[in-house]
Amino acid sequence: MHWLEVVLLGVIQGLTEFLPVSSSGHLVLFQGLMGMEEPELLLDICLHVGTLAAVLWVFFAQILEAAKGFFRFCAAAPKGKAAMVQVWTTDQDARMALLIIIGTIPTGFIGMGFHKIADKLFASPVLAGAMLLITGALLWATRYVRTEGKLLPKVTWGNALTVGTIQGLAILPGISRSGSTICAALFLGVDREVAARYSFLLSIPAIVAALILEVADASAAAHPPVSMLLLGGIVSAFTGLAALKWLLAIVRKGSLWWFAPYCWLVGATVLVANFV
């Protein structure tokens, strides 16, 4: 693998991990264009570590507050159900922490179910193209979502389970994780900013779990030089940081649908190229 390919993959991962256009779908497509049979596992891990670092940087304060809230909820547990319910209803940081845990449960089950067939899924540009069309449709539909939604105290555990399920299904190449989860929250009536914040905080356990699985699989795999791995991770982190901040601004404006035509164009191009 050449240095330029590593930089390009870092840029693709950084942009598409956060912009609602599917990082997995684009990596499948670009790897096909570069003639790589399979992604090099350790490089893929470093690319995801880079984007994880971007999320941790942007949301560090919220992560810290959510952790404190979770411990307050745990401290209330010995006092009985009434005390736990009070924390759930009045402590927004504790509520966010619990919503993340609840949403992670279906994501984990779906991820484990797909883990054994992930290689086959990621080898299919046709599947990525078709799923990009679906991603585009979801993004376009956000044009019709009301401008003011429910704030965090009104977000329910059922909402969290739904968004977590959607996040699990986003393992399919071409389905944007950020796009599908933000869209799901918006369709459930959640406020734009809360939807975006919850989507990215919910991504952290999923990314960490996926990295753990990949590290276990990568122990005996060949890998590029360490310098290339570091380069890919750094490029991914800085590109991801810029993309994440841009997307948050776009979500606040209610302009997620801007990305729909791009998803349709790329998805249709892939399908035509594979069937014509």
Curated annotation (Swiss-Prot):
GO annotation (BP), single: regulation of cell shape
Entry keyword annotation includes Membrane: yes
Record has Transmembrane as a keyword: yes
Xref: Pfam families: BacA (PF02673)
InterPro entries recorded: UppP (IPR003824)
Keyword list, A-Z: Antibiotic resistance, Cell inner membrane, Cell membrane, Cell shape, Cell wall biogenesis/degradation, Hydrolase, Membrane, Peptidoglycan synthesis, Transmembrane, Transmembrane helix
Reaction it catalyzes: di-trans,octa-cis-undecaprenyl diphosphate + H2O = di-trans,octa-cis-undecaprenyl phosphate + phosphate + H(+)
Enzyme Commission designation: 3.6.1.27
GO cellular component, as recorded: plasma membrane
Enzyme class, UniProt record, top EC level: hydrolase
Residue spans crossing the bilayer: 1-21, 41-61, 97-117, 121-141, 155-175, 200-220, 231-251, 256-276
Subcellular location field: Cell inner membrane
Gene Ontology MF terms: undecaprenyl-diphosphatase activity
UniProt topology in membrane: Multi-pass membrane protein
Miscellaneous notes: Bacitracin is thought to be involved in the inhibition of peptidoglycan synthesis by sequestering undecaprenyl diphosphate, thereby reducing the pool of lipid carrier available.
Family according to the record: Belongs to the UppP family.
Biological role stated in the UniProt entry: Catalyzes the dephosphorylation of undecaprenyl diphosphate (UPP). Confers resistance to bacitracin.
This protein's name: Undecaprenyl-diphosphatase
Protein source organism: Desulfatibacillum aliphaticivorans
Lineage: Bacteria, Pseudomonadati, Thermodesulfobacteriota, Desulfobacteria, Desulfobacterales
